[in-house]
């Protein structure tokens, strides 16, 4: 079926280009459907050149949203294993995902909170996001989340939160730093993995966090996209 659809699309385009027919205007982008075929968002057929141009124009963060958009008094404090923020209020999922851990106390971080979820779409699909410290979970393990899901609330405990890329299992109270070849520990050292998550948040409209001119430690694994 997909093959016949492609043939029909090329035929229509050829007729439009060489038969004097005006090609319909492209009104959206192609998206995969459940059967693995393609559907249009906007409902219009397109000249293939328009499809290629539209695909190139799509941002790398398509489908993701700033998870800290509703935090009151948000302040970006520093880059370390992840990114540290001050403020109070709701934290959303950055993209579609599945919760792998959610606890509000005694998880080895200041404030005790720890939430992880594995992204299931977009360029970061398969990677695990963590939010730690002064956060009370609003989700449970196994729950599916979207960019409209509040995963937890930052409370005014004096530590704020740290958020970034977690180890692949999503179950450890350590961040991605050991896997990234960094120096480990709790020191205030900026890491390349933390900087990568900061770049993601900035691309979504979040505030940039400082690294205070320090060298970024560790490496960025190949699985991590650029933003």
Regions found by a protein language model. Name each.
Residues 1-17:
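Single-pass alpha-helical membrane anchors
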Residues 1-4, 108, 154-156, 212:
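Short, surface-exposed loop and linker segments with low hydrophobicity and enrichment for Pro/Ser/Thr
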Residues 10-13, 24, 118, 222:
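Compositionally biased, intrinsically disordered low-complexity segments
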Residues 18-114, 146-147, 194-227:
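Surface-exposed, glycine-biased beta-strand/turn segments
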Residues 86-89, 134, 140:
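A structural connector/turn signal
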Residues 94-138, 155-166:
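Zn2+-dependent peptidoglycan hydrolase active-site motif and core
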Residues 116-118, 143-227:
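Conserved, short, structured surface segments that act as functional micro-motifs
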């Amino acid at each position: 079926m997909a093959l016949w659809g492609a043939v029909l699309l090329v035929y229509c385009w050829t007729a439009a280009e060489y038969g004097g027919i005006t090609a319909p205007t492209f009104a959206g982008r192609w998206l995969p459907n459940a059967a693995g075929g393609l559907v249009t968002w906007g409902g219009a057929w397109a000249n293939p050149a328009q499809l290629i141009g539209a695909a190139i124009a799509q941002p790398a963060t398509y489908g993701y949203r700033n998870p800290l958009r509703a935090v009151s008094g948000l302040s970006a404090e520093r880059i370390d294993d992840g990114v540290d923020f001050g403020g109070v209020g709701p934290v959303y999922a950055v993209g579609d995902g599945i919760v792998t851990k959610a606890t509000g106390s005694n998880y080895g971080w200041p404030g005790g909170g720890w939430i992880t979820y594995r992204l299931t779409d977009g360029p970061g699909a398969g990677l695990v996001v963590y939010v730690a410290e002064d956060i009370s979970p609003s989700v449970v393990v196994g729950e599916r989340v979207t960019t409209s899901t509040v995963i937890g609330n930052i409370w005014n405990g004096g530590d704020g939160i740290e958020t970034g890329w977690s180890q692949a299992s999503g179950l450890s109270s350590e961040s991605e730093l050991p896997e990234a070849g960094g120096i480990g520990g709790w020191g205030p050292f900026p890491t390349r993995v933390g900087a990568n998550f900061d770049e993601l948040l900035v691309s979504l409209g979040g505030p940039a966090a400082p690294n205070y001119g320090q060298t970024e430690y560790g490496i960025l694994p190949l699985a991590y996209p650029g933003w």
